[in-house]
Regions:
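Hydrophobic transmembrane alpha-helices of secondary-active transporters
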Residues: 29, 52, 76-97, 231-234, ...
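N-terminal alpha-helical transmembrane segments of multi-pass membrane transport
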Residues: 1-63
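Entry/N-cap segments of selected transmembrane alpha helices
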Residues: 95-117, 269-296, 348, 352
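Transmembrane helical segments that form the transport core of multi-pass membrane transport proteins
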Residues: 210-299
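Alpha-helical transmembrane segments
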Residues: 155-172, 281-291, 315-319
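Alpha-helical membrane segments and immediately flanking helix-loop junctions
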Residues: 85-90, 105-115, 119, 123-155, ...
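Membrane-embedded hairpin module used as a gating/binding unit in multi-pass transport
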Residues: 165-239
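Intrinsically disordered, low-complexity non-transmembrane regions of multi-pass membrane transporters
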Residues: 1-14, 20, 176-205, 239-245, ...
Length: 374
């Protein structure tokens, strides 16, 4: 019993208020995961890891090893890239392939990345850190991790937490922006959907062609888009069904779990608790807001040139962010709330998957620009 009290006293000796703040942050993330069902597969391990990394007098070398293997450049950012295989296997590009014009909304919804890059530079961050912070607007955790790691950002922990937190908060962040930028009449616009058959050949060629095009125009994004498209090729080829199911479920879930706990390896209070973390969280929110606004405004612009009976519901532009499939569902539900007979899901899904591609390419482009001008 005396030894137990000695150990307790020894632990309390090494405890400080910064650790307690990190315990609180970890507790909040766990609460959001369990009570609010916000990205539980990520926020739960991140929250628990934040507590774990800030316990006094504890040796957690194994988490550092996981970080070296899974996220550091030493092993080529293994976890995010492998996770892209699982994400690619989950995505059905059919709605996009049946209406390729939807790609414009995926591109427009990356506006927040470049706007936030400018804002972060004004806040005093150097070009590499500004680019790493801006990529939070990709609404894509793996892309945020890889870009920040490749550019050697000093703020990797805050960027990772901001990226995944805002992905989880899409149902909270997007609706106010959509309502601010659209009228009730616009939100009630109905859009017809004509299902077009997409051939198996097209589905197989699409990931291959996208990878080649990316290599030509944004070579820095090839590793990102390549793993994403490889996962989709596994899904669409038709001869690897069991492997496709494994990638979608077992592989994606396992890597997500490891990724969450590994992110926490850089959430020690000495790295995380500073004013720049708050600034980064604020800039991340700005990136999400302007991504959403970019998609909506391009839809409103297109409407100026369309006949009255062919108008687009501007809300669909907001689904162009990469948070798949959360954003498409959020916008669809908003449409149903305004008009119970307004079914926007097939439009929003197509735009959402185009945003997945666009965000990865944007990540590669921003890395290319930084390397050219730094």
């Amino acid at each position: 019993m005396e030894a137990l009290f000695d150990n307790f006293a020894y632990m309390m000796e090494g405890t400080n208020w910064q650790m307690m703040v990190m315990w609180l942050i970890g507790g909040i993330l766990i609460t959001l995961a369990i009570a609010k069902d916000m990205e539980p597969s990520l926020l739960l391990p991140i929250g628990f890891g934040a507590i774990l990394m800030n316990l006094p007098n504890v040796d957690l070398h194994i988490i550092d090893v996981l970080f070296d293997i899974g996220i550091s450049e030493k092993f080529g950012e293994l976890f995010p890239l492998v996770l892209f295989i699982g994400i690619g296997a989950m995505i059905d590009f059919g709605p996009l392939l049946s209406n390729p014009k939807l790609m414009i909304f995926g591109a427009a919804a990356q506006f927040g990345i470049f706007f936030t890059f400018f804002m972060a530079s004004l806040c005093g961050f150097d070009i590499k850190d500004a680019a790493s912070i801006a990529i939070i607007g990709a609404a894509d955790g793996p892309t945020s991790i890889i870009v920040a790691q490749e550019l050697g950002s000093s703020y990797l922990p805050a960027i990772m937490v901001a990226a995944y937190s805002y992905m989880a908060l899409v149902p909270i962040v997007q609706p106010p922006v959509v309502k601010l930028l659209t009228t009730k009449k616009e939100r009630m616009i109905r859009m017809s959907y004509e299902a077009k058959e997409v051939s198996k050949t097209t589905r197989i060629l699409f990931p291959i062609v996208i990878t080649i095009i990316t290599a030509l125009f944004a070579p820095m994004a090839v590793s990102l888009i390549g793993f994403l498209m490889f996962g989709n090729l596994i899904r669409e080829c038709g001869v690897l069904n069991s492997l496709s199911e494994t990638a979608q479920k077992v592989l994606a879930n396992l890597i997500t779990l490891f990724l969450g706990i590994t992110i926490a390896a850089r959430m020690h209070y000495s790295e995380f608790l500073n004013i720049n973390t708050l600034i980064i969280m604020g800039l991340g929110l700005i990136a999400f807001i302007f991504d959403t606004a970019g998609g909506i405004m391009i839809a409103k612009l297109i409407n100026l040139f369309l006949p009255k009976n062919k108008k687009l519901n501007p809300m669909i532009g907001a689904a162009g962010i990469s948070a798949f499939p959360m954003s498409s569902r959020v916008i669809h539900k908003m449409g149903l709330k305004e008009d119970p007979q307004n079914f926007l899901l097939m439009h929003t899904v197509g735009i959402n998957v185009s945003g997945q591609i666009a965000s990865v390419i944007a990540g590669g482009l921003i890395m290319t620009l930084v390397y050219q001008f730094s």
